[in-house]
Amino acid sequence: MARAAVKMPDDFLERIAKLNSHFDDIVPRVLEKGAEPVIQKAKSNLAARIGQGTKEPSQSTGELLASLETTKAVQDAKGDWNLRVGVPTTKDSKGVSNALKAAVLEYGKSGQPPRPWLKPTKSATRKACADAMERALDKEIEKL
């Protein structure tokens, strides 16, 4: 059987070693950069869906739209890094949960058809999110 040996360039191996030692510092910054296009698209989709197709004029206060945010990047028990984009369970000035309002818009309820905003955001921003994370990772690697 034929064998081949490939020797990696020393500078490349040094950068990989540095990346390994700084991995836990780099990943949260990369995930946050990847979340930027998602949050922008989610805000525009949500703004377009609020009050859409209703019989009465919208009485939106803007609190739901303002509550859209990202969580901090955290590492789970398996070692995977996660960052969530969405509406937290905070309540608006009238005491109604923003997450409940977002879920009703997304999935509908009895007598109110669904007006999805989060699922189209996920589909539309998958490539942009990956590209943003790749660019951020390349910048972080260049810094090493």
Show which residues each predicted segment covers.
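Short, Lys/Arg-rich flexible segments
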Residues: M1-R84, T89-K94, N98-L144
